[in-house]
């Protein structure tokens, strides 16, 4: 399940950068950004294939994409943050 909400201001600043890129439709730093997130772990609410998409939240100093992601749903401001590569998710509250 989703573990509640998290204020955008409480997330790493790179999460805001990623949300801004999503809002402007890129360009994204990784070719995998924007791919369909399949929700194989069934942590997010069950939806049809293609409902969710994933984007990398850059980890400074990391040599890979790291473990931080934002998953977007089709609803307005339905953006989830995971800092542990899909083990847990929090809905991002962009008003705080």
Curated annotation (Swiss-Prot):
Cellular compartments per GO CC: extracellular region
CDD domains linked to this entry: RNase_Sa
Keyword Hydrolase found: yes
Compartments, record wording: Secreted
Disulfide bonds: 7-96
One matching Pfam family: Ribonuclease
Primary localization class, coarse: secreted
SUPFAM superfamilies found in the cross-reference section: Microbial ribonucleases (SSF53933)
Protein name: Guanyl-specific ribonuclease Sa
